[in-house]
């Protein structure tokens, strides 16, 4: 599984980072970004999917 963050839609609410800190982190501009090339299977896979579902601006997409 791979995910992306649309920087134009991100409002820096931090939901994805709270839910899945091993996949998302803050960038230098204070927005969320993906820190792994591919989300590991298992627990991380589920927290990444939860981040996709919980993002209030739908900035996170599974690709």
Swiss-Prot record:
SUPFAM superfamilies, per the entry: 4Fe-4S ferredoxins
Cofactor: [4Fe-4S] cluster
Cofactor: how and how many bound: Binds 1 [4Fe-4S] cluster.
Entries under PROSITE patterns matching the protein: 4FE4S_FER_1 (PS00198), 4FE4S_FER_2 (PS51379)
Domain of life of the native organism: Bacteria
InterPro entries given in the database record: 3Fe4S_ferredoxin, 4Fe4S_Fe-S-bd, 4Fe4S_Fe_S_CS, Fe-S_cluster_ET
Keyword Iron carried by entry: yes
Keyword Cell cycle set for record: no
Positions annotated to bind [4Fe-4S] cluster: 10, 13, 16, 55
Keywords: 4Fe-4S, Electron transport, Iron, Iron-sulfur, Metal-binding, Transport
Gene Ontology MF annotations: 4 iron, 4 sulfur cluster binding; electron transfer activity; iron ion binding
Protein name per its UniProtKB record: Ferredoxin
UniProt organism field: Moorella thermoacetica
Function per UniProt: Ferredoxins are iron-sulfur proteins that transfer electrons in a wide variety of metabolic reactions.
Domain 4Fe-4S ferredoxin-type positions: 2-29
């Amino acid at each position: 599984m791979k995910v992306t963050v649309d920087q134009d839609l991100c409002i820096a609410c931090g939901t994805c980072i709270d839910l899945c800190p091993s996949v998302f982190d803050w960038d230098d501009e204070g927005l969320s970004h993906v820190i792994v090339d591919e989300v590991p299977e298992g627990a991380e896979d589920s927290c990444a999917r939860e981040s996709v579902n919980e993002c209030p601006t739908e900035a996170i997409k599974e690709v």
